[in-house]
């Protein structure tokens, strides 16, 4: 793929977002073993990711973003998700952590979309 594949991950011991992400990334790597995967995250989540070498080995670039300490997980996630364009250079495809990839995404590179494309909720 020409596009960078980008995830936003904020997780703590009290949720399953890291586990959901792992399933999503594992499914992505079945079809895109060598493509660039960037994960935008905060410091606490990055530590949890780094504690899992098998997971870390599937990530090309773990970008740790400084966020205010008083932000809860939801606000941290929303802040990163709405800032992706300012944090990633070049073209990218954002993948939600609860997405299971069931086939190649190569055709996304050829979509006739100039600046933005999206999938409707509950598709």
Q: What are these regions, as identified by a protein language model?
A:
Residues 1-69:
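N-terminal anchoring/stem segment of glycosyltransferases
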Residues 31-32, 88-89, 112:
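A structural signal for short coil/turn segments at secondary-structure junctions
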Residues 101-123:
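Conserved donor-nucleotide/metal-binding helix-loop-beta segment in metal-dependent transferases, i.e.
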Residues 96-100:
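The conserved acidic donor/metal-binding loop of glycosyltransferases
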Residues 17, 70-79:
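A short, glycine-/small-residue-rich helix N-cap motif at loop->alpha-helix starts
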Residues 81-86:
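Short, conserved alpha-helix that lines the donor NDP-sugar binding/gating region
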Residues 49-51, 74-77, 103-106:
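Short, conserved acidic/polar surface loops in the N-terminal third of protein domains
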Residues 92-93:
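Short aromatic/hydrophobic "clamp" motif used to bind/position activated sugar donors
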């Amino acid at each position: 793929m020409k596009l960078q594949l980008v995830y936003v991950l904020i997780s703590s011991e009290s949720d399953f977002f890291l586990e959901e992400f792992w399933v999503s990334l594992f499914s992505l790597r079945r079809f895109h073993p060598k493509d660039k995967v960037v994960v935008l995250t905060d410091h606490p989540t990055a530590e949890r990711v780094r504690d899992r070498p098998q997971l870390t080995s599937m990530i090309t670039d773990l970008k740790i973003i400084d966020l205010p300490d008083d932000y809860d997980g939801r606000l941290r996630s929303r802040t990163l998700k709405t800032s992706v364009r300012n944090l990633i250079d070049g073209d990218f495809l954002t993948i939600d952590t609860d997405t299971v990839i069931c086939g190649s995404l190569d055709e996304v590179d050829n979509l006739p979309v100039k600046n933005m494309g999206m999938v409707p909720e509950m598709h």
